[in-house]
Design a protein with these regions (language model features):
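Residues forming the flavin
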Residues: 1-266
Length: 266
């Protein structure tokens, strides 16, 4: 469930294992977006270690990973100054790549389909199906062609049930079915609650003299106050393009704070 990096990688790995062991299996991926990658909006830093294992010849197969990270900077901002901070291991992106996650996902979808994976875009998974013993049986997709009033239109198509020996939930952050499964099986028992943030990203085209291909910069501090969790990222990739993003933790206390307005100040 979900044609993102995790779901497609799982589908590819299953097909690879089936081929290695001489078994015929059907692998189906349902994706609510109009195409694979439609909801993958991040301008991402990608560590290729997992891709090296999954598809060792990814370079020959044209994976959209071309811009390596050449320099890391972490800064603390005030309204008028920027202070360089030490690079901690979690911010060391040496040998990683700056990439569009949407492009990477579309490429992974092509690799999956080449292996025989069936991908169904435009189908939102709506319900988890269970066996009588309580184990997961599969999922049901939502009805299509329903009007604003909730009534079927002329193009109505009922949802379909997909039964499987194994169901993998790869919906990403706050997936609707994942929440059902977490509640059903108490998967969050004795666990710390998840934290969430609201991120805003834009792609800028900058003059060539200001473009530093491969530069990755993260910041904390201004324009947020000391009580508000968040920060920014600036990634210089190809063609004078820069991904500029700003993230604010959703636990901010000031009810008048607008993450978008803070992004504009930044």
């Amino acid at each position: 469930v979900g044609a993102g990096p995790s779901g497609l990688s799982a589908a590819i790995k299953l097909k690879q294992l089936a081929e290695k062991n001489g078994r015929e299996i059907s692998v189906c991926v349902v994706e609510k977006g109009s195409e694979a990658g439609a909801h993958s909006l991040a301008g991402a830093i990608i560590d290729p270690i997992s891709l090296n294992e999954l598809i060792p010849d990814w370079k020959e197969k044209g994976a959209p990973l071309t811009r390596t990270v050449t320099k890391d900077r972490v800064v603390f901002l005030t309204e008028k100054k920027a202070f360089n901070l030490p690079i901690t291991p979690n911010f060391d992106n040496h040998a990683n790549y700056i990439a569009s996650l949407g492009e990477v996902v579309r490429w992974l979808a092509e690799q999956a389909e080449n292996l025989g994976v069936e991908i169904y875009p435009g189908f939102a998974a709506a319900e988890v199906l269970y066996h009588e013993d309580g184990s997961v049986k599969g999922i049901a997709t939502g009805n299509m062609g329903v009007g604003k009033d909730g009534e079927p239109t002329d193009s109505f198509q009922p949802g379909m049930e997909l039964w499987a020996q194994q169901t993998i939930f790869a919906e990403g952050c706050r997936g609707s079915l994942s929440k059902q499964v977490i509640e059903q099986f108490k998967l969050d028992q004795n666990s710390e609650p998840q934290t969430y943030g609201l991120g805003i990203k834009e792609i800028w085209e900058v003059p060539s003299e200001k473009h530093q291909p491969g530069l990755v910069m993260h910041s904390a501090g201004w324009p947020l106050d000391s009580k508000t969790y968040g920060g920014s990222f600036i990634y210089h990739f190809d063609d004078n393009k820069v991904a500029v993003g700003f993230v604010v933790g959703l636990d901010y206390q000031n009810p008048y704070l607008s993450p978008f307005e803070e992004f504009q100040r930044f």
